Every structure is written in C-alpha cells, then in structure tokens.
Amino acid sequence: ITDHNRLDQIFLEVRPEVVVLLAAIADVKTAETGPERATEVNVDGARQVARLCTKYHARLIFLSSEYVFGGNRGNYQEDDSPDPNTHYGRTKWQAELAIADEASQWSIVRTSLVYGWPITGRRNLATVIVDRLKNGESYEGDTGTYRTPIYVEHLTEGITQLVTSYHPGIFHIAGTDWMNMYQFGHSVAEVFGLDSSLVKPIPVLAGLPPENSPPEEVEQGLRPDILGLDCTQTNHKLGLHAFSVVTGLKEMLV
C-alpha cells in the first residue's frame, strides 16, 4: 500500500464497492525499532487508501487496534479518548484520524488479541502455546497483561456484517473474557487437552527492559499492560454475539 501509483491502478481496474484494509506492520517490536517504515505503511498507506476510496466512491473498513489506548485500565469503550504509548499504537491512531478525514464513507474496527489457525506461516499466541506444550516445553504467561482475546472467525463475522451493510463510525470487536496471558495459556492447555502444569505465571515487566534483555522481555516491555475492549455498544448496534475464549478455542478443534 506504499506504492501509490499501483494502488490507483488497482482501484481503477477493480472499481471496488467496499475495501477492507488489513495491511499493516502489526508487530509492536518491529514498529518500535523501525518507526519510519511503520509510519509509512500504517499511516501514509492508510491515508492513500482512504483518498482512493473517496475518489472511486468505495466504502472503507479499517482494522485498527486496542493499542490506540494507553493500557492503564482496560475494557475501553468506543468513545474513550485514545492515548497510545507505543509507536505502533500511535500509527494506528494517526491512521484512524487520516481515514476519518480523507474517506467519505468509513468504518473503523478496533480489535484485541486475535488467535486461530493461520493461513500463512505467521503464528499467533494460541498456536505458539499449543506447539510449546505439545513439545513438552513450558509457556510463561505474565499475570499483569490483560486483553480480550478473540477467535479470528468471530472477528471475521463482525467485519462481514460491516461489509454487507454500511455502519459509519468506530466499532470494538473482541471476546467477552478479560484475562491475563497466564489465564489464556491455561485455557489453551485445558481445551486442547495439554499439560497445564507447563503454563507458568510470571509477573508483568514494569517499563522498558534493560539493554541486552532476552527478546521476549524486550517485546513484552514495549506493550501496554492493561488493555482489552468493551464491545457492548458494537454488539448492540451490529447485532453481534459475543463469545468466550473457551468457545473460540473449541472451534479451533473442529
């Protein structure tokens, strides 16, 4: 989405009625260590897509993130004021502002920790935990980082609702369970019938970790602690059913 000429050509050829913008640098650590590139993709790319949607009279649905919030209380509602404290979060908020300014018809979907079987090679937390426990390795889940995890198919159902009928504004689509990563690891172990004793609790790291820390500590140290989304308003507006983590994990077994 950083090739503006190619983007324009695609819009001209396809003439889309609805565009769902998922493309982004979504890894927090990558955005922090390469801020210019993250801004180019996440902000400038989103702005250009928004402009082209207006030019070609297409609706835009943009996937944003709970990282637009500061992470100091959790269960954020749609009308809470963003206050990001990571570069990734700042780029997503800036993209939201650009889309609201440039697109004539837009919907923004903020979501939380997404899990499920990946189509591509990229793993997510649930599959990482499954792989570790199957290999007899431990998973250390911190007890101070809270999210509202959502199964990818449930997120897709919400986005599909926005594709089929136009609803302008900001929406929160996430799971019902506000839980820490240790609790999430336990849920994965129990649903998949794996050894839950391999799931170990660790305290959340306060602030940025020291230089030369292990990679997992560096990544964790860049993340806000207490996030998670309150989806009550969105579920009511769109007629969505909210699902628990256990429900989503069980669907992975089907």
List each language-model region with its residue ranges.
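Catalytic helix-loop patch of NAD(P)-dependent Rossmann-fold dehydrogenases
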Residues: E40, D44-Q48, V68-V109, L113-Y115
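NAD(P)-cofactor binding segment of oxidoreductase domains
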Residues: V19, T33-I61
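Mid/C-terminal beta-alpha module of Rossmann-like enzyme folds, strongest
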Residues: G158, S165-E217
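NAD(P)-dependent short-chain dehydrogenase/reductase
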Residues: L97-R147, H154, T160
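SDR active-site strand-loop-helix element
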Residues: V19-A23, L60-E66, G70, V109-T111
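Glycine-rich Rossmann NAD(P)(H)-binding loop
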Residues: E140-Y146, F171-W178, K237
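NAD(P)H-binding glycine-rich loop region in Rossmannoid oxidoreductase-like domains
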Residues: I1-V41
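Conserved C-terminal active-site "lid" loop/helix of NAD(P)H-dependent oxidoreductases
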Residues: V152, N180-H186, L205-T247, E251-M252
